[in-house]
Amino acid sequence: MGAQVRLPPGEPCQEGYVLSLVCPNSSQAWCEITNVSQLLASPVLYTDLNSSINKLSISANVENKYSLYVGLVLAVSSSIFIGSSFILKKKGLLQLASKGITRAGQGGHSYLKEWLWWVGLLSMGVGEAANFAAYAFAPATLVTPLGALSVLISAILSSYFLNEHLNIHGKIGCILSILGSTVMVIHAPQEEEVTSLHEMEMKLRDPGFISFAVIVTVISLVLILIVAPKKGQTNILVYISICSLIGAFSVSSVKGLGIAIKELIEWKPVYKHPLVFVLLAVLVLSVTTQINYLNKALDTFNTSIVTPIYYVFFTSMVVTCSAILFQEWYGMTAGDIIGTLSGFFTIIIGIFLLHAFKNTDITWSELTSTAKKEAVSLNVSENNYVLLENLECSAPGYNDDVTLFSRTDD
């Protein structure tokens, strides 16, 4: 009889569960639990078991924190590259428009010959790769909100390189977006609910997610085939809605492929699992569709409008998909849920300020001078009000005297 094998915290100890063991000769064995029995109440064994569990728990906590920090760094790097890619691609599209070539918003694909557009695409590819890796280390509810940083970077760079003005409202909106993202990071779940391809497959087979996927697919097809040809050039929400709806599938695919890569590093035969190829096909199709319609949105509308609205729609879809598929919200307390929602609504308010007042040319000096003028006018009006009040107070006294005098005569 060999030594006892203790499962780390979080691993289910139930019949039929398959686990991986590393043998002394550097080989790997797969074991299936066939019988589960209770341990005898031995004080020595109980103490030894508690000690081992505590060590494993501490090790698991350290590993979770390490993974969380790695995911945060990758997510921030992703936002920097993606935010820059919007500017580079827009710059390339503007250069093509100045040459009189058919624009992407009109169905043209001449941007494929513009090197600056390719630099932007490469920057977006690096950002998406970092984002891809971030989903393997941290929950989707934590990684996705950090995309608000791309809004900030895109807004700042567009004011410098595209001559798109960023007023005081836009700056306040950027700050609110960062604060909202920080709140969401603090209250986001810090443990992954799906850690293997088998669990991922079970989640994908859930009736709730299947219904969600069918509804999103039908809406996307209606927008692509019917609405986009008629309203795409005049309504910014059409192209962005397509990108956001399809983006929900891309994030789910990225999460699953990230889990597959982690299992591949652990020498598990994931290449034999058909789910890997299904996720890869969905990822390629969804990313291709996103790039196509995002190009049309950027070429047709202002970058400072496209970026924030795309962020709000995309984040909403990802959070919804994450809640349905990965069920990360089930492990959160009521306070964390309220904090996450508050942070997200703070981001939306910041995005609204960035978008709604973008054509309002107001500076900080104008705001301060206006406040001073209002204070002076308020003091003048208060003095006039006091003077009128004194006159009004004296008038009734005079009338009373006259009335009293007339009554005396009577």
Curated annotation (Swiss-Prot):
<dbReference type="InterPro" id="IPR008521">
    <property type="entry name" value="Mg_trans_NIPA"/>
</dbReference>
<feature type="topological domain" description="Cytoplasmic">
    <location>
        <begin position="229"/>
        <end position="233"/>
    </location>
</feature>
<feature type="glycosylation site" description="N-linked (GlcNAc...) asparagine">
    <location>
        <position position="25"/>
    </location>
</feature>
<feature type="topological domain" description="Extracellular">
    <location>
        <position position="136"/>
    </location>
</feature>
<feature type="transmembrane region" description="Helical">
    <location>
        <begin position="68"/>
        <end position="88"/>
    </location>
</feature>
<keyword id="KW-0813">Transport</keyword>
<feature type="topological domain" description="Extracellular">
    <location>
        <begin position="255"/>
        <end position="273"/>
    </location>
</feature>
<protein>
    <recommendedName>
        <fullName>Magnesium transporter NIPA3</fullName>
    </recommendedName>
</protein>
<feature type="glycosylation site" description="N-linked (GlcNAc...) asparagine">
    <location>
        <position position="35"/>
    </location>
</feature>
<keyword id="KW-1133">Transmembrane helix</keyword>
<feature type="transmembrane region" description="Helical">
    <location>
        <begin position="337"/>
        <end position="357"/>
    </location>
</feature>
<feature type="transmembrane region" description="Helical">
    <location>
        <begin position="274"/>
        <end position="294"/>
    </location>
</feature>
<feature type="topological domain" description="Cytoplasmic">
    <location>
        <begin position="295"/>
        <end position="304"/>
    </location>
</feature>
<dbReference type="GO" id="GO:0005794">
    <property type="term" value="C:Golgi apparatus"/>
</dbReference>
<feature type="topological domain" description="Extracellular">
    <location>
        <begin position="1"/>
        <end position="67"/>
    </location>
</feature>
<keyword id="KW-0472">Membrane</keyword>
<feature type="topological domain" description="Cytoplasmic">
    <location>
        <begin position="89"/>
        <end position="114"/>
    </location>
</feature>
<comment type="function">
    <text>Acts as a Mg(2+) transporter. Can also transport other divalent cations such as Fe(2+), Sr(2+), Ba(2+), Mn(2+), Cu(2+) and Co(2+) but to a much less extent than Mg(2+).</text>
</comment>
<feature type="topological domain" description="Extracellular">
    <location>
        <begin position="326"/>
        <end position="336"/>
    </location>
</feature>
<feature type="topological domain" description="Cytoplasmic">
    <location>
        <begin position="358"/>
        <end position="410"/>
    </location>
</feature>
<keyword id="KW-0333">Golgi apparatus</keyword>
<keyword id="KW-0460">Magnesium</keyword>
<feature type="transmembrane region" description="Helical">
    <location>
        <begin position="137"/>
        <end position="157"/>
    </location>
</feature>
<feature type="transmembrane region" description="Helical">
    <location>
        <begin position="208"/>
        <end position="228"/>
    </location>
</feature>
<keyword id="KW-0325">Glycoprotein</keyword>
<feature type="transmembrane region" description="Helical">
    <location>
        <begin position="305"/>
        <end position="325"/>
    </location>
</feature>
<comment type="similarity">
    <text>Belongs to the NIPA family.</text>
</comment>
<keyword id="KW-0812">Transmembrane</keyword>
<dbReference type="GO" id="GO:0015095">
    <property type="term" value="F:magnesium ion transmembrane transporter activity"/>
</dbReference>
<dbReference type="GO" id="GO:0000139">
    <property type="term" value="C:Golgi membrane"/>
</dbReference>
<feature type="transmembrane region" description="Helical">
    <location>
        <begin position="166"/>
        <end position="186"/>
    </location>
</feature>
<feature type="transmembrane region" description="Helical">
    <location>
        <begin position="115"/>
        <end position="135"/>
    </location>
</feature>
<feature type="transmembrane region" description="Helical">
    <location>
        <begin position="234"/>
        <end position="254"/>
    </location>
</feature>
<dbReference type="Pfam" id="PF05653">
    <property type="entry name" value="Mg_trans_NIPA"/>
</dbReference>
<feature type="topological domain" description="Extracellular">
    <location>
        <begin position="187"/>
        <end position="207"/>
    </location>
</feature>
<keyword id="KW-0406">Ion transport</keyword>
<feature type="topological domain" description="Cytoplasmic">
    <location>
        <begin position="158"/>
        <end position="165"/>
    </location>
</feature>
<feature type="glycosylation site" description="N-linked (GlcNAc...) asparagine">
    <location>
        <position position="50"/>
    </location>
</feature>
